[in-house]
Amino acid sequence: MRVFIFKPDGIGDFVLTTGALRTLAVELGEENLVICVRSILVPLAKSQFPNARILELPTAAKRKVLNLFARNIIFCLPLALTLRATHFDAAICFRSMRNYLETFLFYVASTKHFFACENLLLRNKRRVRAAVEDGARRIFRTTLVPYPAGADYLPSEIEAHRLLVSRVLERPVAAEEILPTLRTTGEVPTGHWICAPITNLGSKIYPLPLWVQILVELQPQSVGKKIFLTGASDDRERLEGFLSLLQAAGVQNAEIVLPPDLEAYVNLMAGADLVLTIDTAAAHFATALDRPTLVLFSALHRGMFGPWSRSDKQVWLLPELGAGESKPSWPRGVPPPRAAAAARKLLKTQPQHGASKPRKLTKRKPSKK
């Protein structure tokens, strides 16, 4: 049975899908999976699923010369021809916000069985998009899974994956089966901390001077440890500014480490005794690897992509209400002393590189109003 899996998403989104992919690999055979991901994710996908066939989705996010849509269509034509020439027993799309090109590439796959989650972009009520999606559903008889409003124990993205895999396998899939996991594939350095404070989404940023205060407070706990400041290659300039602030504040054991690829990033993250980050891909990497992790969570898109955890090693720190506030202020709602205290508690209660206590996924009791 050959199955086409379409995941045209970002790095963190791919990590959130790894649990679903592993469940499908166990049930259907990893060698029968054909996984299509963006160019930057191809090495990571190959390392995590070495027996699957990995196809590159060569789309760009920014226009250089051509109109972006035209550029992406031209570059994706070879992929479209490959998908049309290959017979699949089923096609599964794990993206819940499909644009027109992604919709086309999904349905160009040669199969009679399509599985997808409801396209959330339909909620903006644009007539053309609605007509395209409805027409595709009718023509290809797609099995559509409604996007979950929210689960009691999983972010809605992971819950959507669980529901979709359940439909494909025609059996109930437990929440524990679908939790994201990453595996190391090379040498894993140990004895270090990681601080990943940068993201492209400004509303999720925790100010670097406040990070400095946190790491100053954690100096007694970081004695003998290297603190690796990490991120994407284009984050170097901001990380250099951060490093200068740390050194000026007396934190001398920090250094910038930018792994050459995502596979090396996984190995670096896997050996960390503590990961300090915000709601970005680093949080999902660290959690999927079950490392002691403190996420300073802006609460943006809360319930959709996070919080989630594999065990009691992961803590997502939410902003707290201040006096007279109707909603939490980010990042004022997570002051450095509170974050440092949470990190110390995490270090104290978790043995380094030891066994963790798996999280028991049970439904929460309804809150009393």
Give the residues covered by each predicted segment.
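Catalytic machinery of carbohydrate-active enzymes
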Residues: 1-369
